[in-house]
Design a protein with these regions (language model features):
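Switch/coupling segment of Walker-type NTPase motor domains
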Residues: 1-103
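Non-catalytic, charge-rich alpha-helical accessory subdomains
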Residues: 89, 94, 98-179
Length: 179
């Protein structure tokens, strides 16, 4: 860092992407780079309030991109070497996630296309095991979508997810929230 990265960055002669896990490089030369006209951005996964953000929704161009995002998210959050005895839960959770991401991609304004909104939708999908007639705000959202566009791709995945019992749906939601 001291003899390679800092001297090269301080020459200010090109754009940089610097891995700085300790934050010492940005602390030591971030101000210099900003004074030279650089836009310094930090992705800090520990202190998110001090971090610039990454929103994968910005890069979703088509349905295949959505599928790939969900698949990669599940792969990235599965511990190495672990295998589920029953893949049903991961498959069902990915169907729910696909429904939510497709809904946001095609129906939400750009500022609501993000993972915090996915979590908000997930929380809106409250399931009551003792009341089969209960309709959650998320159910209402997809009911309205069905009235407007019964062939919507998000609706197809939501129907697949929603075909289980209340107890099963609750377990699927917990599986997804844990990811």
């Amino acid at each position: 860092t001291r003899f390679f990265c800092k001297p090269n960055a301080m020459q200010c002669n090109t754009s940089f992407v610097i891995l700085d896990p300790k934050g010492e490089i940005v602390r030591d030369i971030g101000g210099l780079l900003e004074n030279k006209g650089y836009e310094v951005r930090v992705l800090d996964l520990i202190n998110m309030h001090r971090s610039h953000c990454y929103n994968p929704f910005v890069y979703l161009r088509n349905d295949n991109d959505v599928q790939r995002l969900v698949t990669n998210l599940f792969k990235a959050t599965t511990p190495k070497g672990s295998q589920s005895q029953d893949p049903f839960w991961d498959t069902a959770a990915s169907m729910l996630l696909l429904a939510l991401v497709f809904y946001l991609k095609y129906e939400a304004p750009p500022d609501e296309q993000n993972f915090p909104m996915v979590m908000e939708l997930l929380r809106a999908g409250e399931v009551r095991e003792d009341d089969d007639s209960y309709v959650s705000p998320l159910d209402e959202l997809f009911d309205r979508l069905e009235m407007v566009n019964p062939e919507h791709i998000a609706l197809k995945y939501y129907r697949d997810y929603h075909s289980g019992s209340a107890k099963t749906l609750k377990s699927i939601q917990i599986t997804l929230a844990a990811r």
